[in-house]
Design a protein with these regions (language model features):
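Intrinsically disordered regions, especially transient/low-confidence alpha-helical propensity segments
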Residues: 3, 18-19, 304, 346
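Extended rod-forming repeat segments used as scaffolds/tethers
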Residues: 10-12, 19, 297, 339
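Bacterial N-terminal signal peptides
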Residues: 16-32
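N-terminal secretory signal peptides that target proteins for export/translocation
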Residues: 1-15
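Predominantly soluble domains enriched in secretory-pathway, periplasmic, or organellar proteins
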Residues: 31-355
C-alpha cells in the first residue's frame, strides 16, 4: 500500500471507528516512514568483451543490473568517497602475447578514455580523456587526480578529474599495466610488461624517481600498510616478488608454481594484511601468501582464468572475475571454497566492492 493510499485509509477508519485496524495501519505507516536503505553492499564487475558493467547485490548474490560503458572496460576503481566508479575504456583490439599486432584491426582512439559511473544514478555520466589505450589506474587520495597506464604509449598519464584533461604524461617502461599509489599518496608505482620493470613516479612533482627490474611481465603492485614493503606479480615467472620500497629494489621471489602453468594476475591483501591473495590466470586458482614469512600458504580452485579480485567489506568473502567462463566466483575465505558462481556478460575483468 502506498503512503497516500494508507493515509486515506487511516482517515476513513478513524471516522468509522475501526480502532484495531486504525492502530495496525498507523503502525504500518510509521514503518514506511522509518524505512531505510537495504543492508549489504554491491559488487561491480567490468566485462571486457561485452563492454558493460555488471552490478551484483550482496544479499541475493545475483546480477541486478547491467549497464553499457564502452569498448573494452578493464581497470576499475572507486572514488575515495564511494560515490563514483571510474573505468578504463580502450578502443585498441585485444593483442595476446605472441600475436603480430600489425595483423589486428586499427585502434579506435575515440573510444579511449576513463568512464565516470555515478553510483547513485547507476549509469555512466561522463567520459574523461585517458590517453592512448588506458588499461589500469589509481585515484589520488583527495579524489582529484587519476594516474593511468597507457599501454601502447609506454607512459603514465595524470588526469585532472574536474577538468577532464590530461595534465602530463610520464615515460615508463614498455607496455605499462599496473598502477598503484603508496598508502601516503606520494608515489606512483607502474609495472611494465614489455621490459619487466617498475617505474616510481613522484605524484606531486610529476617526475620519474627510479625504474628497476623485477621479473617477466609484471602485472600489479600492492603495498603493506607501512609502505616499506610491496608485492608485484610476474606473470611469466609464475612468481610474486617482494619489494623493498625504501631502496626501490627487489628483495626476494615467492615462487607459486611452474612458469607458464601458473600466471599470477591480480593481488589483494586481507584486511589485517596477514595474507596476500593472488589470482593465477590459466592456473584456475587463487594462491595465498603468508606476509609474515613471505611464503606460499596454500591455494584453492575458483574458476577459469581468474583475473581481478576484491574482498567483501568484512574481509570474509572473496570475489574473482573469471573471463572465459563469464562468471564471478564467490569464495568463503573461512573454508576457502566457492559457494556460488554468478553469471555476467562477456569477459569479466575487474572487480570493485562498495558498501
Amino acid at each position: 500500500m502506498r503512503y497516500r493510499e494508507m493515509l486515506a485509509s487511516v482517515r476513513m477508519l478513524t471516522h468509522g471507528g475501526s480502532v484495531g485496524l486504525w492502530t495496525a495501519l498507523i503502525g504500518g505507516l510509521l514503518l514506511v516512514g522509518c524505512s531505510s536503505k537495504p543492508s549489504g553492499y554491491r559488487i561491480y564487475i567490468t566485462n571486457e568483451i561485452s563492454g558493460d558493467l555488471s552490478v551484483i547485490d550482496s544479499t541475493s548474490m545475483d546480477v541486478v543490473s547491467t549497464i553499457p560503458l564502452g569498448k573494452r572496460p578493464r581497470g576499475i576503481h572507486a572514488s575515495p568517497d564511494g560515490k563514483t566508479i571510474y573505468v578504463a575504456l580502450s578502443g585498441s583490439p585485444p593483442a595476446p602475447p605472441g600475436v603480430d599486432e600489425s595483423t589486428l584491426p586499427p585502434p579506435d582512439k575515440d573510444a579511449d578514455g576513463i568512464g565516470v559511473f555515478d553510483v547513485a544514478q547507476n549509469k555512466m555520466v561522463r567520459m574523461l580523456k585517458g590517453g592512448s589505450d588506458p588499461e589500469n589506474f589509481d585515484v589520488s587520495l583527495d579524489g582529484k587526480t587519476i594516474y593511468v597506464s597507457n599501454e601502447d604509449a609506454s607512459g603514465v598519464s595524470f588526469i585532472d578529474i574536474a577538468a577532464g584533461t590530461i595534465t602530463k604524461t610520464i615515460k615508463t617502461g614498455e607496455e605499462p599495466e599496473g598502477v598503484k599509489l603508496t598508502p601516503d599518496g606520494k608515489l606512483v608505482y607502474s609495472t611494465a610488461e614489455g621490459d619487466g620493470t617498475v617505474s616510481v613516479i613522484d605524484a606531486a612533482a610529476g617526475t620519474l624517481v627510479k625504474t628497476f627490474k623485477v621479473g617477466r611481465r609484471p602485472r600489479n603492485v600492492v603495498f603493506m600498510p607501512s609502505a616499506k614493503r610491496a608485492y608485484v606479480n610476474a606473470e611469466n615467472d609464475g612468481a610474486v616478488y617482494l619489494l623493498d620500497t625504501e631502496k626501490n629494489e627487489m628483495m626476494q621471489p615467492i615462487q607459486l608454481g611452474t612458469p607458464g602453468e601458473i600466471k599470477p594476475m591480480g593481488l589483494a591483501l586481507s584486511l589485517d594484511s596477514a595474507k596476500l591473495y593472488v589470482t593465477s590466470g590459466r592456473g584456475h586458482k587463487v594462491f595465498v601468501i603468508d606476509t609474515s614469512t613471505n611464503q606460499p600458504a596454500g591455494s584453492f580452485e575458483v574458476g577459469q582464468r581468474p583475473w581481478g579480485l576484491a574482498l567483501s567489506p568484512d574481509g570474509k568473502t572473496l570475489f574473482t572475475a573469471n573471463g572465459p567462463s563469464n562468471d564471478v566466483s564467490v569464495v568463503d575465505l573461512g573454508t576457502q571454497t566457492v559457494t556460488k558462481k554468478i553469471k555476467t556478460t562477456g569477459g569479466p575483468w575487474g572487480v570493485v566492492v562498495l558498501k
